[in-house]
């Protein structure tokens, strides 16, 4: 199964331009490519991968599906396991990355992230870091985002979870969470000046990783929606702006 670059994810300077852009059907499935909101000059060629010894390529994945994902139940720091679909998604991720020489694989310490990474890694070293774990969301953990079942949570959580200083009654504020993730991604980057690594983390964690690398505002970062089976590629090299793509397969 060959990996292909999607059209680059365009980063614009005007926060008002945050939107989802529907890509051409022959490149992208029904999901829209995300248009982030800060300008980057995106110059890359799939054939040129690996030519620069100073380029660090970060493959950024989200863990496979869990039953709580299906139920729209808020997981946060609760340790939930992959379901059968999630394990199949992890196996497909391993297939997609087959042939890519990875130097290391990173996951959080939560089972859904770590088990996804275990399925993918083969004999590549796995490093599980608590700093990559999902945001702790206090009293909302375990509750459903369903207006018919729990209308209070469905109304309260979306608003409070976007407040940068709200610790959600025993959880982490977005500012605290961002600092945790930023420190962790800086540590990871300090270990790899070049080569290729895989990070398997969580929805909000990955938002904060992209925020740290691309210097996004908080509203820009939390507008990102990465599905359980979506894979991003970040390229970093000295003297150039970071570059971001969503990777697709011929099956898409």
PLM region spans:
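Bacterial N-terminal signal peptides that target proteins for export
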Residues: 5, 11-13, 19-34
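Bacterial N-terminal signal peptides
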Residues: 33-43
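Acidic, low-complexity terminal tails and accessory targeting/binding regions
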Residues: 48-56, 135-147, 190, 195, ...
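Phosphate-coordination/substrate-recognition cap region in phosphate-metabolizing enzymes
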Residues: 53-55, 91-156
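Generic beta-sheet signal
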Residues: 58, 188, 195-203
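Loop-to-helix element that buttresses phosphate recognition and phosphoryl-transfer chemistry
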Residues: 65-116, 169-182
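Short, well-ordered beta-to-alpha junction loops that form the rim of enzyme active sites
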Residues: 108-110, 131, 181, 200-204
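Short glycine/proline- and acidic residue-enriched helix-loop micro-motifs
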Residues: 155-176
């Amino acid at each position: 199964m060959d990996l292909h670059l999607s059209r680059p994810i365009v980063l614009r300077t005007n926060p008002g331009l945050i939107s989802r852009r529907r890509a051409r059907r022959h490149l992208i499935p029904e999901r829209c490519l995300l248009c982030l909101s800060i300008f980057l000059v995106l110059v890359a060629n799939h054939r040129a991968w690996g030519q620069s010894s100073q380029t660090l390529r970060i493959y950024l994945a989200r863990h496979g599906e869990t039953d709580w994902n299906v139920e729209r139940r808020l997981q946060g720091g609760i340790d939930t396991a992959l379901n059968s679909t999630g394990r199949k998604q992890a196996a497909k991720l391993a297939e997609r990355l087959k042939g890519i020489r990875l130097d290391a694989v990173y996951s959080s310490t939560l089972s859904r992230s770590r088990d996804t990474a275990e399925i993918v890694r083969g004999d590549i070293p796995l490093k599980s870091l608590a700093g990559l774990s999902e945001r702790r969301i206090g009293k909302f953990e375990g509750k459903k985002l369903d207006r018919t079942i729990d209308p209070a949570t469905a109304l309260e959580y979306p608003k409070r979870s976007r407040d940068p200083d709200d610790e959600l009654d025993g959880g982490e504020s977005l500012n605290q969470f961002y600092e945790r993730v930023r420190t962790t991604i800086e540590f990871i980057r300090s270990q790899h000046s070049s080569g290729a690594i895989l990070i398997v983390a969580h929805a909000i964690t990955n938002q904060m990783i992209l925020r740290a690398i691309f210097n996004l505002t908080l509203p820009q970062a939390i507008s990102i929606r990465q599905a359980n089976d979506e894979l991003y590629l970040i390229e970093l090299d000295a003297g150039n702006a970071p570059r971001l793509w969503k990777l697709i397969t011929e099956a898409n």
